[in-house]
Amino acid sequence: MLHLTPLIFLSLAMAAAVGVWGVFTWNGGFDEMDGIVASHQSTGILGLQHCPDLDRGLMSMVAFNLPVVGRNPIFPAGRRFMVQFLANVAVIPVILNTEGARAEPGSLVRYSTTWGLFSQMATSAVMCPLYGFWFVRQSGAKQTEGGTLRPLPPNKWVVPSSVLIGYGIPALLSFDPFQWGLDLQIRGILAFTLYPLCISLTARLMRKVSKKRGRSLSPEWNSTISYVAVGVVGMVSHLWYLGTGLTGYPLSGDAVSSVAGPTEVGRAAQLVLLFLQIDYVITFAAMLLLAWHELTRHQLVRSWRAAGTLAVGWLFLGPGATLAAAWALREQWLSRPRGVRGEIKQKPK
C-alpha cells in the first residue's frame, strides 16, 4: 500500500479544497467576513494607516479567527474547539522545522517557513497533504538512490524554543487571556497568522546568539523531547475538550458586539467553526498518514498495527499527541548508530 500513499495525499488535498473552501464559500462565509471587516476596518497598527489596502487585507485575515476566539464569544463551542485545535496543531511546526533542518539543500521539505505560510493562507488541510506528497516522493527517491538522512545540526533546542516563542505565545495572545482589550487581541491574532515568520526570525536570532557565544548542546541531546512536550500539550487539550463537552451553549446576544452585531458574529462563528472542523480532520488525516508511512517504511511497526494504533490514539489521546508519539519513535530510531552502509541498526519487528 506504500506505493498508493502519494495518490492518497493528492486526494486529500482535493478533498480539502472542496470540503473546506467549497463549503465555506457555498454557505456565504466570505460575505460574513466582509461584514465583520466593515465594522472594524483597521488593525490599529501604527504605520499601516498609510497603506489602507494592506491594513484591510490584514484585518480580513484577523476577522476569520476573531469570532471564535473572542474573550466573551457568543458561540463558546468555537473558543473551546480553537483551544484544543491550536494545542494539537503545535506538533506540526515542530515537524516542519525539524525536517526542514534535516533536509538536503534544494529539497522542498527544507522550506519550512514557506510551508507554514502556505498553511496559513490556504489552510493546513491543503498544505499537509501536499507536504506529505513531496515528503514521500523525496524520501522514496533518496531510498532508491541509497542515500541516508542528514543528521540534525547542532543546537537542536533552537527548533522547540523558536516554536514555543513564535507559535505558542501568539496562539496564547490570540485568546486575550489577560483581557487587554480588542485592539491588542487583534494584534495577537495577526501575530499568530504570521507565526511561520515569527518562528523563522526567532530561530535565526537564537542561532546567531549561540554562534557568537560559542555554545551548543551536545550531539547526544535527545531531540525526541520536543515531540514529547507538544504531545503532552495536545493530549491534555484533547482530554479537556472531551471533558467540557462537544456541544456548544445557546447563543447569547451580549458578546463581541463591538466587532459586529450578535446575529452576524453568531453566523460567522458557526461557519468558521465548521470550516475549522473539516480542516482539523483532513489536516491530521494527512499527517497521521505520513506518520504511518514513515513507521511502515522504516519497519518500526507492522502496517496494520501502525494503522490501528494511530486510529485509536486519535480517539483517546488526540491527533496531536498521537502524531507526536509516532514522530518521536521515528526520531529515536534515526538517532541510533549507523552501520557501514549508512543503515541504522535495529532489530526486526
Swiss-Prot record:
Coiled coil regions in record: none
Membrane-crossing residue ranges in chain numbering: 4-24, 81-101, 116-136, 158-178, 181-201, 228-248, 271-291, 309-329
EC number: 5.4.99.-
Domain of life, source organism: Eukaryota
A single GO cellular-component term on record: membrane
Topology versus the membrane: Multi-pass membrane protein
Molecular function via GO: isomerase activity
Alphabetic keyword roster: Glycoprotein, Isomerase, Membrane, Transmembrane, Transmembrane helix
Primary location: membrane
Keyword Transmembrane helix listed: yes
Chain positions carrying an annotated carbohydrate: 222
Pathway: Antifungal biosynthesis
Subcellular location: Membrane
Family: Belongs to the membrane-bound ascI terpene cyclase family.
Function: Cyclase; part of the gene cluster that mediates the biosynthesis of the tetrahydropyranyl antifungal agent restricticin that acts as an inhibitor of CYP51 and blocks the ergosterol biosynthesis. The highly reducing polyketide synthase rstn3, the short chain dehydrogenase rstn4, the cyclase rstn5, the FAD-dependent monooxygenase rstn6 and the enoylreductase rstn7 are required to generate the first stable intermediate desmethylrestrictinol.
Protein's UniProt name: Terpene cyclase rstn5
Gene coding for it: rstn5
